[in-house]
Amino acid sequence: MAAAAAVATISAVQVEFLEFPAVVTSPASGRTYFLGGAGERGLTIEGKFIKFTGIGVYLEDKAVSSLAAKWKGKPSEELVETLDFYRDIISGPFEKLIRGSKILPLSGVEYSKKVMENCVAHMKSVGTYGDAEAAAIEKFAEAFKNVNFQPGATVFYRQSPDGVLGLSFSEDVTIPDNEAAVIENKAVSAAVLETMIGEHAVSPDLKRSLASRLPAVLSHGIIV
């Protein structure tokens, strides 16, 4: 009798009309990443929840062994309530690629203003905001100045363990060959992901997705 095929631990995620593939390769970094989780980001306006962005967090394969050491065997219900789990994703010694694709049109200035406000508020709250971070935030703002996001357009954030934040922009979901800006500031880089999945997360949906998907990967490895 033939052995049963291994059950996939990684699959694509659909957020509105946006599909987040299970695995992507970045021509900018030459690395391949698996989809940790994806979810929507929105705001309640006049009593109605409006979805603006779909966010996907992709992780380098070495994230599995790094996270499994502490979190393997933990159920989703526990992980989703555990801030340290998300902080270990944010600060872990592996590369991340965050994809933010627009559901509604948004100017780069509007989008980046909110991201920067959240990042600065977090850094000030934990005491990591100084002159170097202020300069890095200015560079972040400059990168978005001439960008206008139509539905489906995307910003990619590449985060390296040594604190480099690479930004690239696409009119669709194609990862560009070259990055539009590179910001070398560990506190700012970490703050971008912290504001998405940390204590005051802009996407609780993304947090739930990470907590529901990663236990299988940590227990059985990456199976596509």
Swiss-Prot record:
GO terms for molecular function: chalcone isomerase activity. Keywords: Flavonoid biosynthesis, Isomerase. It comes from the Eukaryota. It catalyses: a chalcone = a flavanone. Substrate binds at T53, N118, T195. Its EC number is 5.5.1.6. One of its GO terms (biological process) is flavonoid biosynthetic process. It is an enzyme of class 5 (isomerase). Pathway: Secondary metabolite biosynthesis; flavonoid biosynthesis. It holds the Pfam family Chalcone. The record marks Y111 as: Important for catalytic activity. Transmembrane segments: none annotated. InterPro entries: CFI, Chalcone_isomerase, Chalcone_isomerase_3-sand, Chalcone_isomerase_bundle_sf, Chalcone_isomerase_sf. Belongs to the chalcone isomerase family. Part of the biosynthetic pathway for all classes of flavonoids, a large class of secondary plant metabolites, many of which are brightly colored. Catalyzes the intramolecular cyclization of bicyclic chalcones into tricyclic (S)-flavanones. Responsible for the isomerization of 4,2',4',6'-tetrahydroxychalcone (also termed chalcone) into naringenin. This is Chalcone--flavanone isomerase. It comes from Pueraria montana var. lobata (Kudzu vine).
